């Protein structure tokens, strides 16, 4: 079980070509390329989402993790969120996906974030759906910032929509100062490949919007 703050920058990329150009321009070392499957949970009326929470079960290379994220605080272009997460067995993940258990069961009930989410959801959560994300992680040296891990994502959303983006997580300590220098460095890197620095919204929100478009 881990608990921490996540401070990250997200910028949209127009297409796969831009993603490849960004990786080349960063001139770093590709650390990994993994496929993630993300399952989102909420109450039927999306009460968690309405109160700023995101509840996710993720499978990556056979490893399963439940993550609860709290409401977002903006730090410039960066998003600052508290989160708590727990690794679980494939068997427990299967029970959650079958509706026989809730992801909230595996989280630390003594953590304030979990208590708030449980009170909000009344423990009645269902699986809303899932989406796939390919993540390429590149370690690079960003001018004016220093060592950084860039996460270059390709996300498959409902309706055949495919989004691309780059993420950079900033250490929570001294987040305001670090986020500002990271934002400048990442904007400069995008400028070098001729891509405008357009902040991206969270994947869960884009997934739900794409899901609603299908239903509508």
Give, region by region, the residue ranges found by the protein language model.
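Phosphate-end processing signature that detects enzymes handling 5′-triphosphorylated RNA
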Residues: 1-216
């Amino acid at each position: 079980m881990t608990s921490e703050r996540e401070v990250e920058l997200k910028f949209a990329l127009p297409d796969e070509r831009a993603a490849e150009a960004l990786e080349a321009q960063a001139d770093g070392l590709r650390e990994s390329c993994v496929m993630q499957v993300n399952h989102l949970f909420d109450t039927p009326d999306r009460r968690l989402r309405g109160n700023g929470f995101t509840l996710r079960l993720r499978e990556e290379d056979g490893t399963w993790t439940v993550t609860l994220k709290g409401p977002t605080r903006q730090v410039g272009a960066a998003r600052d969120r508290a989160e708590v997460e727990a690794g679980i067995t494939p068997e427990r993940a299967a029970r959650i996906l079958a509706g026989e258990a809730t992801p909230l069961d595996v989280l630390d009930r003594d953590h304030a974030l979990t208590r708030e989410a449980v009170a909000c959801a009344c423990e009645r959560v269902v699986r809303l759906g899932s989406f796939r994300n390919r993540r390429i992680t590149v370690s690079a040296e960003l001018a004016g910032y220093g060592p950084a891990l860039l996460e270059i994502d390709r996300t498959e959303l409902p309706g055949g929509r495919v989004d691309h983006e780059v993420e950079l997580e900033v250490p929570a300590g001294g987040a305001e100062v670090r986020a500002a220098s990271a934002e400048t460095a990442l904007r400069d890197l995008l400028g070098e490949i001729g891509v405008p620095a357009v902040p991206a919204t969270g994947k869960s929100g884009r997934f739900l919007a794409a899901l609603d478009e299908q239903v509508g």
